[in-house]
């Protein structure tokens, strides 16, 4: 039924709960999972009370952390015997939810699976409001998986 499942991940326990649900579905349906991690510089910058100049070194650290999140998620999917692709995307403006929807359309995803209430700040991927926006605007079905 769903050949392509898009799964945004941020490394939080809630995000991993969503990933586990996607893996279970993909195994039954023979689907491919596409992982998406957004390096969201705007959220990182606004998480500080005082203004601070972010250096290339800080952005490199954010990207490296994102690559680690994707690698861990890929390992989990591969261990379950499910085909997997991964994408790291840097966002300098706009909402993460808009990017998730755009990437779902671009890849031809037939389902989006995401955990709700992820982390804030550096590890932020999807919060309640972003998950709600994905749910409202997505052209494909969305499975929201609530964290334990």
Show which residues each predicted segment covers.
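Small/aliphatic-rich secondary-structure junction motif
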Residues: 3-53, 76-85
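Short, hinge-like loop/turn segments at secondary-structure boundaries
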Residues: 51-54, 103-105, 130-131
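A short acidic, glycine-rich active-site loop
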Residues: 54-68
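Structural beta-alpha unit
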Residues: 75-112
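Glycine-rich, Arg-bearing micro-motifs that act as flexible, cationic patches
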Residues: 111-133
């Amino acid at each position: 039924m769903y050949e392509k499942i898009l799964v945004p991940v941020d490394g939080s326990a809630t995000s991993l709960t969503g990933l586990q649900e996607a893996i279970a579905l993909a195994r039954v349906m023979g689907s491919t999972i596409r992982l998406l991690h957004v390096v969201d510089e705007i959220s990182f910058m606004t998480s500080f009370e005082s203004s601070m100049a972010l250096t290339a070194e800080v952005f490199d650290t954010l990207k490296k952390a994102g690559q680690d999140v994707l690698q861990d998620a890929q390992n989990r999917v591969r261990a379950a015997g499910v085909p997997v692709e991964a994408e790291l995307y840097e966002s300098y403006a706009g909402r993460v939810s808009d990017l998730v929807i755009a990437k779902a359309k671009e890849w031809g995803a037939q389902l989006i699976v995401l955990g709700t209430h992820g982390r804030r700040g550096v590890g932020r991927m999807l919060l309640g409001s972003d998950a709600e926006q994905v749910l409202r605007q997505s052209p494909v079905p969305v499975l929201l998986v609530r964290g334990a």
